[in-house]
């Protein structure tokens, strides 16, 4: 019996998940991850609509070295510049815009931000031009880390679970399209919580499965590609965040300039007496 892992507290209330789609072949636009036997099922939770992938493909191998090359190509600088040149037509432009709108009262303060899974580092690169904050990234793919170095950005080659940050604490942690890639999103958010200062905030983006699934041939969309172990709904994202010790300030569904359906959320770390 498949159980929606985002709802551990409600396990006893879930009898089963509905099969959303059984993939015998990768979607046409999915990057070629050189998977020999492609067999993947996606289940949909009856309670929250959350989508969970079930397969034996070792997606952890994607992020060690080859994910950056397969998903972005060998010429990262070209991809990076292409996104920059899109300006207001890029998803990142609007991400930074809503991010700074939320944190506008802190814009001139000396804050610290940890960006988890920095990828091309375009988010913290854009922020560096506007704010004077301490910006640090953490990224498991060595190719992305090397590229960040060419941009003179501090991106650590590791992941949040490794403990490499030791006793460091941050005002803000951002996870842009990250928690859908891990087996246990709640666990990752709880780890993130530990790296936040007591009045800290978290910013999260995830694919919106509810809206994507309503499109014609929605199961073939990017939101359901093999590297996404979870695809969220507003209800499931809300639960994941609240189970991790945060109070949601803002949670919305948007259609980005790229055509992606995305959920974003701003949340604040709960104080000990609020848990």
What are these model-derived regions, one by one?
Residues 5-14, 234-252:
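A SAM-dependent methyltransferase catalytic signature shared across enzymes that methylate proteins
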Residues 177-181:
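A short His-aromatic
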Residues 208-210, 255-258:
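Short beta-strand->alpha-helix junction loop in the catalytic core
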Residues 1-168, 172-176, 186-189, 253, ...:
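Conserved N-terminal segment of class I S-adenosyl-L-methionine
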Residues 183-187, 214:
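Short N-terminal helix/helix-N-cap motif within the alpha/beta-hydrolase-1
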Residues 186-201:
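A short glycine-rich, Lys/Arg-flanked "PGG" loop and its adjoining helix->strand segment in the class I
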Residues 20-28, 204-230, 235-240:
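Short, glycine-/aromatic-enriched active-site segment of Class I SAM-dependent methyltransferases
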Residues 135, 202-204:
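Hydrophobic/aromatic residues located in beta-strands of well-ordered beta-sheets
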């Amino acid at each position: 019996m498949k159980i929606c892992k985002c709802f551990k507290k409600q396990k006893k209330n879930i009898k089963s998940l509905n099969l959303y789609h059984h993939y015998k072949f990768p979607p046409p636009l999915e990057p070629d991850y050189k998977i020999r036997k492609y067999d993947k099922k996606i289940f949909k939770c009856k309670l929250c609509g959350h989508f969970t992938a079930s397969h034996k493909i070792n997606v952890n191998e994607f992020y060690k070295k080859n994910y950056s090359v397969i998903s972005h190509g060998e010429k990262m600088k070209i991809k990076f510049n292409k996104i920059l040149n899109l300006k207001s037509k890029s998803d990142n432009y609007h991400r930074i815009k809503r991010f700074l709108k939320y944190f506008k009262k802190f814009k001139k303060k000396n804050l610290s931000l940890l960006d988890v899974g920095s990828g091309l580092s375009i988010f913290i690169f854009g922020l560096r031009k506007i704010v004077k904050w301490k910006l640090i990234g953490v990224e498991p793919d060595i190719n992305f880390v090397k590229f960040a170095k060419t941009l003179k950005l501090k991106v650590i080659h590791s992941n949040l679970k490794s403990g490499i940050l030791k006793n460091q604490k941050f005002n803000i942690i951002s996870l842009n399209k990250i928690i859908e890639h891990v087996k246990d999103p709640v666990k990752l958010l709880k780890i993130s919580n530990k790296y936040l200062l007591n009045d800290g905030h978290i910013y999260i983006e995830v694919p919106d499965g509810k809206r994507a699934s309503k499109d014609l041939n929605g199961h073939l969309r990017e939101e359901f590609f093999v590297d996404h172990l979870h695809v969220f709904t507003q209800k499931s994202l809300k639960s994941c965040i609240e189970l991790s010790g945060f109070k949601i300030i803002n949670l919305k569904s948007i259609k980005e300039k790229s055509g992606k359906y995305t959920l974003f959320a701003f949340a604040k770390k709960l104080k000990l007496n609020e848990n």
